[in-house]
Amino acid sequence: MKKTKILVIDDELDMRTFLSTLFETSGYKPLLAADGVEGLQKAREAKPALMILDVMMPKEGGVQLYRDLKSDPATKHIPVIMLSGIAKKTFFHSQNLLNQYTGKSLPEPEAYIEKPPESDELLAITEKILRAKRGNLPNV
């Protein structure tokens, strides 16, 4: 059986290793990227079922990468879980400001989890999002 691909985009090696191990031992196929530029390329090439995206990264940060992903016809359908040390309220405030500034409103990510993530919570949210995607049900 083909394993479901999950793209993890995070600049912290320890976090990529943790998430890769968590997803691999849970039956998924983790794909890894260390920054937004690499992440966007892998998202386009690998077409993962789900992306885990850190907010604060070098080269292209998670906020800009999220906007790029959701503006690209090839990747806009891929669900995203934002994972960050930044408070959820702060992230959504910045998204709203960018939406107003650019005049382009984008959908909110399927989930936002503050670091460090609890394994059980992350896996439960991941499965819920993937189940909804398979059944074309509303997201989390």
Identify the residue ranges that each predicted region occupies.
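Active-site residues of response regulator receiver
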Residues: 10, 54, 84
